[in-house]
């Protein structure tokens, strides 16, 4: 009783075909194929050595020393 036979599989396939239509199923399978090929491409790229990281340059302007910035402890809106 718990086994699925060929007739049950054919009926399920027919219901799916009627619900989604032939065009929608072919679109889904095409998208699935693109996903698999993209996944394989990603795996192949992982094997390649990574390019060296770009050098990060420091700031182009000089920062003020911390003492100069904190001379007046009042908030900026209350100065004056």
From Swiss-Prot:
It holds the Pfam family TatA_B_E. The chain crosses the membrane at residues 1-21. One of its GO terms (cellular component) is TAT protein transport complex. Residues 58-80 have a biased composition (Basic and acidic residues). Keywords: Cell inner membrane, Cell membrane, Membrane, Protein transport, Translocation, Transmembrane, Transmembrane helix, Transport. Its main location: membrane. It comes from the Bacteria. It is found in: Cell inner membrane. GO terms for molecular function: protein transmembrane transporter activity. One of its GO terms (biological process) is protein transport by the Tat complex. InterPro entries: TatA/B/E (IPR003369), TatA/E (IPR006312). Residues 38-80 are annotated as: Disordered. The keyword Protein transport applies. It is a single-pass membrane protein. The Tat system comprises two distinct complexes: a TatABC complex, containing multiple copies of TatA, TatB and TatC subunits, and a separate TatA complex, containing only TatA subunits. Substrates initially bind to the TatABC complex, which probably triggers association of the separate TatA complex to form the active translocon. NCBIfam families: tatAE. Part of the twin-arginine translocation (Tat) system that transports large folded proteins containing a characteristic twin-arginine motif in their signal peptide across membranes. TatA could form the protein-conducting channel of the Tat system. Belongs to the TatA/E family. This is Sec-independent protein translocase protein TatA. It comes from Erythrobacter litoralis (strain HTCC2594).
């Amino acid at each position: 009783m718990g086994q699925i036979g060929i007739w049950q599989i054919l009926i399920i396939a027919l219901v799916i075909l009627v619900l989604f239509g032939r065009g929608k199923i072919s679109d889904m399978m095409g998208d699935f194929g693109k996903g698999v090929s993209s996944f394989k491409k990603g795996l192949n790229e992982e094997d390649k050595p990574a390019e060296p990281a770009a050098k990060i340059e420091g700031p182009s302007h000089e920062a003020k020393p911390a003492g100069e910035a904190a001379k007046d402890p009042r908030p900026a809106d209350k100065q004056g």
